[in-house]
Amino acid sequence: MRSMTRHNVSNIVFSSSATVYGDATRFPNMIPIPEHCPIGPTNTYGRTKSTIEDVITDHVNAERNRLKKESKPFEHWNGALLRYFNPCGAHPSGIMGEDPQGVPYNLLPLLGHVATGKRDKLLVFGDGT
């Protein structure tokens, strides 16, 4: 954040995670999870993402307040926090989702094929990284 300020960078896009919500089923009417769902991470990964979101939000607000006090334009300071989900599943037709027609090339559909008996085993090439 200091480097952003030093180099006159005032916009940041952060790849966060939906894990910041934690167990959304603890609240009524929160599935599917709306953006106004209260934050409540339940693991270290989610807490880390939530903490970074807080740091970004605090920094953007501090810079805006500083510039406002100096009677300078402050609106150019922005932060975007993108909370991704890792959805899996498939449309029953197999046209889209994790049950592709033909040979799958992604890990999740390959694992699904092993689990359902469509494939005997999962081959890992190299060291698996």
Regions found by a protein language model. Give the residues of each.
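Alpha-helical substrate-binding/gating segment
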Residues: P87-A90, P109-T129
